Amino acid sequence: MAHSGNGESFHDPLRGFIQRNCFRWNNQKLILQCFMALAFVGITSSTTQPDIEGGALLQLRDSLNDSSNRLKWTRDFVSPCYSWSYVTCRGQSVVALNLASSGFTGTLSPAITKLKFLVTLELQNNSLSGALPDSLGNMVNLQTLNLSVNSFSGSIPASWSQLSNLKHLDLSSNNLTGSIPTQFFSIPTFDFSGTQLICGKSLNQPCSSSSRLPVTSSKKKLRDITLTASCVASIILFLGAMVMYHHHRVRRTKYDIFFDVAGEDDRKISFGQLKRFSLREIQLATDSFNESNLIGQGGFGKVYRGLLPDKTKVAVKRLADYFSPGGEAAFQREIQLISVAVHKNLLRLIGFCTTSSERILVYPYMENLSVAYRLRDLKAGEEGLDWPTRKRVAFGSAHGLEYLHEHCNPKIIHRDLKAANILLDNNFEPVLGDFGLAKLVDTSLTHVTTQVRGTMGHIAPEYLCTGKSSEKTDVFGYGITLLELVTGQRAIDFSRLEEEENILLLDHIKKLLREQRLRDIVDSNLTTYDSKEVETIVQVALLCTQGSPEDRPAMSEVVKMLQGTGGLAEKWTEWEQLEEVRNKEALLLPTLPATWDEEETTVDQESIRLSTAR
């Protein structure tokens, strides 16, 4: 990190400038620039601070002997919570680590104990050896510990008796010997089978929570009598249940489906025709969440490509923040949202999986991926989006949002609409995806206040400043998406600083319009297009991205304007007049100095978010 000659950090004057000026400017462009600057300062400053948990994970990786380089963790990190695979975080603390069935052959480093907030540690089905770390007893937050099917040797350290919060302990199929702390036999789920640990008949304690101790001969007769009586009672109960079931079946509707998967979450969940998958089915479909199947990452978790036994391709969304207070709520919210939102331009949920440590959603796999991919990330030989398809995306997305806002009860706010969240089916029809950031609000409310979540460049200014989102927040994001469709560019692009001061696509478009350079707005990859249709979509986009939410149209109005029946000409004339006034006012305001050196602003543009990174 660069420093000035007097030892002052590069960020100090910039941070001071922001704090003195940004929050007293009532101007959309300057507000967005300030938030961008704050994001930049926060991200780059954090790289200078040591990350204890990140260092501990790197030590763990080294001790595991990751010869196949499965753990692509790097020392050039901000935090392991941002992008490291197999790591689950709550806030900025690691709470779960799942490294099962990974082919590791090393040892378990005591550095693992630096993960003070770890709740779940899964290392089963590897070839790890050596002694169990004594210091693991200090990890008092551990609830799930699975070290089964390895080659650990020695005894269970006495310090492990301090693990008072354990609910699931599996040390089976190891070379362990010696005694077992007495309190471990009171854990809800435990397994010491396949070891030489003292349990079973010799200790009169079971070796696993699912097994029973052998009964003595003095109790055999009583057991036989009890067993006979139980069988008779069971037969009577079974016959009674059959009668009740037949009577109930006549009355119930065919859509009332309950799910209860043994070994998973015991709660019964009814969600219509959704399929409940077992965790094993999901693991088989995704090759145990193999990183080679990773196709995306959002605010609530990673998305993997999967293949079901019937050869159906699916997209599996593994929620990353289940352990946080919002994790369970996020899962239930998404299930509820999809169950009430059914539209041809909305992504259909086909199933889910829930266990004590996992929340997973299963969607159809979209062969043509996302609009963002088709605009900017094509591989050699792949086909881009022609103008008719882009126009179809604009119309379909508008219809999908209109349905969420005006035809769902309660209404639904997406809150992260962008080209990357618009998927394309086999016929290149658009469907809105990623309802992990959606928010249900009561129809009697005009907005909902929550933490700011979304992608910088697509977030409406009032949402940035107040945290209040409404339908008009989505309208703003839709307008930016229209500009992405026309230009093929990102909502934020630092490379523009080489020629102008506008890093935001919205400001760049306004600049070109002032200079009457409409042709320069259109994506250079478009060889043919209708200039009148381009003009219409740009005008609608700018009406949708006005600074005041009250000035933005509702999505039903947007649909009408796109269809040519919404009075676009009159609204555009009014916008031009207001824009002229806004430009004059902007000239009287100070501007943010462009003091960022290109080499010091290497920030991943698609990853600049105001939500907690996962």
From Swiss-Prot:
LRR repeats lie at residues 115-139, 141-163, 164-187. It catalyses: L-seryl-[protein] + ATP = O-phospho-L-seryl-[protein] + ADP + H(+); L-threonyl-[protein] + ATP = O-phospho-L-threonyl-[protein] + ADP + H(+). Its EC number is 2.7.11.1. This is Probable LRR receptor-like serine/threonine-protein kinase At5g63710. The modification Phosphothreonine is found at residues 286, 312, 389, 449-450, 455, 466, 545. One of its GO terms (molecular function) is ATP binding. The modification Phosphotyrosine is found at residue 463. The keyword Calcium does not apply. Residues 289-573 form the Protein kinase domain. Glycans are attached at residues 65, 125, 146, 175. Belongs to the protein kinase superfamily. Ser/Thr protein kinase family.
